[in-house]
């Protein structure tokens, strides 16, 4: 048999659940890279991950590394021997490095002369001799931010390692990994099945581990089982389970043998806003809440146990007992908070610092109130409501609920505002001011909320840039990248008539003399335009399309987006490549012009080609102006694409730098007008 399945399992103490999947997939990727580097062929790699183990299985791995021919070229013959024909030191040094003498070297003739060369055949090694190093290297390259030592060992890993098993077919690969000798013994579930047992063949994994050790090693299998059983439990209770992907994967990483169970809590807790209850169920307890068909929270939840007793009553009651104090706390905080109105919490914001140089949260609230009102006027929504929402925007940070359950900020402000009798749009804006919270998150639904969300984000961006604390490298303590992208998404996707430069200027004015960066407006605008690039690249739009628009630096995001869509469309046209090249040529010609360029004079035209182009660009200049005003850049570029034929004819038949100054200036005017037409949309000369 020329191939065998290879298994490596690393048995550890409990691995960090949020890192488990990344560790496992990285381990598999690293093993694959090491095998490829060694020239070892295989069919497929499978990865396994459970709380106390990482494993990789390589299917049909070649048992022998292939032999390979190597060729090492040395110095030129002219430099390898001196005038007397003796080897030079350069030649001897090269030969020594190859393990031969100069006389044993071959010669190879090239068009640059004759060279010394050493050819050799390196015999491939048995795969079993390479696997220990392959595994060690793969583990060494895992993304482990804080490795640890244990016992008296000097090795480091993310958690202490207790067992290592490496099998090529039925053969044990002897060696030491992370200070532990490879052996056939693997460990089962901590509480179920056999504690330890031997594995005889790689093909027995992972079924043997499930049968004897009560461990489902396949991460995706456990995940699918938890999902299916959770959905079934919820359906049986007349509801739908709220199963977020991130929480599902975390729960999958916490159990070796999943046992999905349902439990309940007292209905009186449903008087508390559902978001607070869900926060503690998901965040603290790793439970899946259940909602009815109308989206109302039910007094039930689903949890996943790592043990499977015949009677689960004790486990269910235990989880109900554990969650009850947390829900009681939430109930107490909610009832206590209702005793004081949001607006009455404003003075307390003066005791909390937003940023030392930028003042307190009360200062920030005052700025948001004013800027939200300005934005509301520009986008045609209720200024008074936007200002009221801005004024109350941070008051819920002073409540007991948000202090204890920080992720409920905003949503609790909404509930408290409703209780206080605030306008519904104002209340909703208190929640939606933080949207979008992450990539792909939904946007504020109302324009009032959009005004407050934008005011908050621009205040943070302007303030932090204004004191010279722009993000550096990966460090972004004020989440400015997220704020910038969120603001851009709101403006673009809601097609709001807002200008970045104008908003930053208005925001900066509200800080008084607190800002020290004189270039804050340009810095913030450039930063936000840079986030456009990342956004569009994620959408699959080519970099040169984005650069073509960035070259014009349009500061209205909705307008910027329209230009990008237009250039992206233009790039697909048959004439795009030729016109991009022509515009590049035009740019070079105009850059060398030594005098001011005037308007086109048709009476000066001599050649038919120049007259045809002049008439075409003049006609189009008139035709596209209304389209430019409407922002219909796609139609503009579609019309300009018709210039390909007259442009090609012009460059084929007309000499721009004519001896006659009037003729030369008129031809430059034609090209200048041509370039100007395209520059009203983008600089297409940068298109590749």
Curated annotation (Swiss-Prot):
EC number(s) for this protein? 6.1.1.14
Q: Which domain of life is it from?
A: Bacteria
Q: Which GO terms describe its biological process?
A: arginyl-tRNA aminoacylation; glycyl-tRNA aminoacylation
- Per UniProt, the enzyme's principal EC class comes to ligase
GO CC terms for this protein? cytosol
Please give the NCBIfam families that the UniProt record associates with this protein: glyS
**SUBUNIT field:** Tetramer of two alpha and two beta subunits.
Q: Which family does it belong to?
A: Belongs to the class-II aminoacyl-tRNA synthetase family.
Query: This chain belongs to which protein, by name?
Result: Glycine--tRNA ligase beta subunit
Query: Where is the organism placed in the taxonomic lineage, from the top?
Result: Bacteria, Pseudomonadati, Pseudomonadota, Gammaproteobacteria, Pasteurellales
Source gene?
A: glyS
